[in-house]
Swiss-Prot record:
Biological classification of the source: Eukaryota, Metazoa, Chordata, Craniata, Vertebrata
Species in which this protein is naturally found: Danio rerio (Zebrafish)
Purpose: Involved in the development of the inner ear.
CDD domains to which the protein is assigned, alphabetical: homeodomain
Domain of life: Eukaryota
The protein's name: Homeobox protein MSH-D
Amino acid sequence: MEQRKTQVSSHPFSVESLISSHKTNKDFERRREDVSSQFAQTEIRDSCGSAGIPKHFMLQTSPVKSESPEPDDCTSWVMNSRYSQTRQESPCPLRKHKTNRKPRTPFTTSQLLALERKFRQKQYLSIAERAEFSSSLTLTETQVKIWFQNRRAKAKRLQEAELEKLKLTAKPALHPNFSLPLPLGTQLHSAVSLYGQSYPYQRPLLPVAPVGLYGTPLGYSMYHLA
């Protein structure tokens, strides 16, 4: 009877055998999942460092610098170059005057007219004249002295410019080797008008043969010449 029970229980199509086989399948799948999860954890542990960071990330953050610049360095370089270009392209600063330079004296219209009038009369003032003139204009002697110095320099520049203009307008239009023929009987005033200089005019003399060389009397020769 016991053998029959064992035979019945061991039958492959029995309920107990089916339940036991189902349990074994579940256990096998659970064990396989555990093994696969353990294997994945070991792979991750092998691929990561001590701090749990992947090795490829650790290689990028290694102290050895690669040939290509890092993103942060590239960004900082671009920003620095952009701002440096804007600083270079900024307009050049104005010329700085000396700190100890005195400000320019603002003259009034009446003072300028009086200074110009005095300069036309006399370009150089003596010490007494300068003191008197500056007191009449309520200016200092230094201001009057500096104004006269600047005005003399301006007058010199204007004079040089006028001389250059006269030189340009006075250039001869004809070639320097070209000369106009003058007739023999040209009067003195024509020579003076052309050259601006006066020279004593002399009529050219014709060669005359001596009288003693001819055998005929003087009166006869003069008669025939007439």
